[in-house]
Amino acid sequence: MKALEKRIAGHARAHLTALKTRRHETDLSEAQAQQIIGRIVNVLGQLPAAVKQAHERMIGGRNVANKDKILSLYDDSLNVIVRGKAGANVEFGNKLWLGENSDGIIVDYKLYQDNPSDSSLAKPAIKRLVDDRKIEVKQVWCDRGLAGKLNTAMLERRGIGDGFCPRDVADLSDKLANEPGFREGLKRRAGTEARIGIFKNVFLSRPLLVRGFEHRELAVGWAVLTHNLWVVAHMAEAEKKRKEDQEQKVRPPKARAA
């Protein structure tokens, strides 16, 4: 592997030198040539660290700290996200927070450049909605990854209903049995998982074909806007149909000829 890497790096350096000295013989503009040169230099600069990382994992069998890992030669703003899902214990990328209202409109979103814990995401989200945008929030529903005493206390101080799914099975059973509306709220929240899938795969595209955190953040913003326009259009169409059906019901039947 190391011998192959040295050969490939040698070819890259040769092409780099040729492009720098003989660019005038090509049909590339100065800007296009600099773009290619920058890409080659970027990869060559990371090769020693990439080889060391591969040696540690493949030959030495040793783990590499996340902060020292090269996840992509072309984008250094990705993170290792532990998911614990079957067949995908970890994922690579940026954590995305989405919050929707009961109509399915995304009212809050944030793409994180770092990798905060799930339980720490609720408080800043409530602050953005209530304090910054002056939106009245009566109740919130989240999965058990956000449940915790700190978040429960935060919601209680703000007078917001706590619909977080408890991590403890006994607490969950108690809420399902004794708290009015809790079961229905969790069922509605389950639909958010489908919303996330639609958002990622339809509106955001998967994989997201942009590099760099700022470009990904911008793409998410445009996707949220497009998604919400789509939802509003469907709501308007549904309301129009409801009114037409209502008018049809109250309209007197046509008289038939004897």
Model-derived regions, located:
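Anion-binding and metal-coordination hotspots
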Residues: 1-258
